[in-house]
A protein has these predicted regions:
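Double-stranded beta-helix
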Residues: 11, 149-210, 234, 254
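Non-heme Fe(II)-dependent double-stranded beta-helix
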Residues: 1-15, 22-125, 131, 240, ...
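A short secondary-structure junction signal
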Residues: 121-127, 136, 152-158, 167-171, ...
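Short, structured patches in soluble enzyme cores that scaffold and shape functional sites
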Residues: 110-112, 127-129, 144-148, 160, ...
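Active-site region of the double-stranded beta-helix
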Residues: 103-104, 129-135, 145-155, 163
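Non-heme Fe(II)/2-oxoglutarate
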Residues: 43, 47-50, 60, 172, ...
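A short beta-loop-beta micro-motif enriched in histidine and acidic residues
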Residues: 101, 128-139, 190-191, 197, ...
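Short, conserved beta-strand element in jelly-roll/cupin
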Residues: 133-151, 196, 204, 228-232
Length: 270
């Protein structure tokens, strides 16, 4: 694993809001990730989240039908698959996330297997953290390419520098370009950057980075594994997102999200 970051890489990440690390996984590691992620997805069957009544009503399940049309999306695989858990709990990944954001520690917010199916439509522009249950400038996501990610099969696009603020979120079902109508200042930023990657490469992006993904115009599925991290010490903002029902109901706005059974600490300098 290519897990050593240079000062230049950290500076680039903080300026642009994202970074691509080529050949993050070596050949053997890539095959291991492909197998273990694939097995975890297969064992989950048709369930986006762990098969537990405590997840009924979560935002992820509300959008299950819409997502199914173009994504095979499976979340929180670490909760019910030990081989995968060992991959995503790798302290080296957590340290990279903490170093890029300059925080003392990170917890898992959500992992997601994102398999963009053949001929699937685009993924609209969005920011991650405004959808989540905490407000933080230092949320961060790793996106690992299990297949080559190309302009033709659904690579990510990042708008450099867009991680400096939150933007108005378009109403569900509105056109892809609606975010630019609501937030014309985005048009003043550099043009979207296509994050093409060879299999085994990865990107990190800040939780406020405006990003999306192109359509898959090929007959093959494009596989990726992602994980969003929140800074240790983050507090609850009142949104449910993917929190289990019982835990969600136990929280008050401002409570620290430090339940290791829901948001495990994967790296800390302390």
């Amino acid at each position: 694993m290519k897990n050593t970051l240079t000062e230049e890489q950290i500076a680039t990440y903080r300026k642009d809001g994202f970074i691509i690390i080529e050949d993050f996984l070596d050949t053997k590691e890539l095959e291991d990730w492909r197998f273990k992620v694939g097995e975890a997805v297969k064992l989950r069957e048709d369930n986006p989240l762990p098969t537990d009544d405590d997840y009924e009503g979560s935002d992820a399940l509300k959008h299950k039908k819409d997502i199914k049309a173009y994504y095979q999306q499976r979340m929180q695989l670490w909760m019910d698959n030990k081989p995968f858990k060992e991959l995503i709990f790798d302290e080296r990944i957590g340290k990279m996330a903490a170093d890029l954001e300059g925080v003392d520690g990170v917890r898992i917010w959500q992992d997601q297997a994102l398999f963009k199916l053949a001929y699937a439509e685009l993924t609209s522009w969005h920011q991650d953290v405004p959808l989540w249950s905490f407000n933080a400038k230092h949320g961060i996501t790793i996106w690992i390419a299990l297949d080559d990610a190309t302009i033709n099969n659904g690579c990510l696009y990042f708008i450099p520098g867009s991680h400096k603020k939150s933007y108005i979120k378009p109403e569900p079902g509105k056109p892809h370009a609606r975010v630019f109508e609501l937030n014309p200042e985005l048009l003043e930023l550099p043009a979207p950057f296509p994050a093409t990657m060879k299999a085994g490469s990865c990107s990190f992006h800040n939780g406020l980075m405006m990003h999306g993904a192109s359509a898959n115009m090929t007959p093959e599925t494009r596989r990726a594994m992602t994980c969003g991290f929140m800074p240790d010490g983050s507090t609850f903002n009142g949104a449910r997102n993917i929190l289990p029902e019982k835990y969600f109901q136990s929280l008050n706005v401002g409570d620290i999200l430090d339940n290791n059974e829901v948001n495990p600490l994967v790296y800390s300098r302390k």
